[in-house]
Structure formats: C-alpha cells, structure tokens
C-alpha cells in the first residue's frame, strides 16, 4: 500500500480517534516529520505520551489521546510565510484557527518544526504544515 502523505494520514487518524473518544491510537507509517509534529502537539498539551514502534517495515507510532483536540488537519498547499505574517494573524490564517490565542499552527522552520508562537519568538518564518485547536 502506498501512502502519499504520511502526515495527513496520521492527523486524520488522530482526529477520527478523538471524535470517537478513544484513549489511544496507532498510526502508521511513521516518519520523522510526523514525529516532530507530534512533539509540538505534546508540548502544547494536545496529546499525551507517544512512542515509536519499529515493526521492521515502516514503523508505527502509538499515541495517547487526552480529549483536547476539536479539529486537526494539514495545510495544503504548504504556504511559505514570514515571521511578521505569523505575528499579525492575517485574514488567510483565520481559515485554520478560530482566534489568534486559540490553537496552534505548526510551522517547519530552519530551527526545526515549531508552533507559530515559538516561530514568532525566534523571529523566523517557514512553511505551514498543520493546524490544531
């Protein structure tokens, strides 16, 4: 089976498990990008612990859910943004978050995968990957 977008597959599996009030979900195939996005979601308090399980093929990720996610998804196409655009909360960003201080936009920056708040603090731009609130 060929999965075109592993990040979109993982986030949709998390969302589906979350709306069905599951306590954990197993996501496969695993990728470095998916693991880095999960680290940001864990830092922001949306998910609990997660662990990588090496099954000899693609790998799996077992994620503990906390029931705090209302909506999660990828941003397609992946827009490049400057840090000023993230700080000002432009109109197009309102399509993904209900308000500036509610939720998180996940950004791939030269400093790694960060939340939009961390990217503004480090004054760096990047490519928008996903949103969660």
Swiss-Prot record:
One of its GO terms (molecular function) is structural constituent of ribosome. GO terms for cellular component: ribonucleoprotein complex; ribosome. Gene3D superfamilies: 3.30.1370.30, 3.30.1490.10. SUPFAM superfamilies: Ribosomal protein S8. Pfam families: Ribosomal_S8. GO terms for biological process: translation. One of the primary rRNA binding proteins, it binds directly to 16S rRNA central domain where it helps coordinate assembly of the platform of the 30S subunit. Belongs to the universal ribosomal protein uS8 family. Part of the 30S ribosomal subunit. This is Small ribosomal subunit protein uS8. The lineage of its organism: Archaea, Thermoproteota, Thermoprotei, Desulfurococcales, Desulfurococcaceae.
């Amino acid at each position: 089976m060929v999965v075109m977008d592993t990040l979109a597959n993982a986030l949709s599996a998390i969302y589906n498990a979350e709306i069905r009030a599951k306590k954990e979900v197993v996501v496969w195939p695993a990728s470095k990008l998916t693991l880095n996005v999960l680290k940001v979601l864990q830092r922001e308090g949306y998910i609990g612990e997660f662990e990588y399980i090496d099954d000899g093929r693609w790998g799996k990720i077992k994620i503990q859910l906390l029931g705090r996610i209302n909506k999660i998804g990828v941003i397609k196409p992946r827009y490049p943004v400057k840090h000023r655009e993230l700080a000002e909360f432009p109109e197009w960003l309102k399509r993904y978050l209900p308000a500036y201080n509610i939720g998180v936009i996940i950004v791939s920056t030269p400093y790694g995968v960060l939340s939009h708040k961390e990217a503004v603090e480090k004054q760096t731009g990047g490519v928008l990957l996903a949103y969660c609130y």
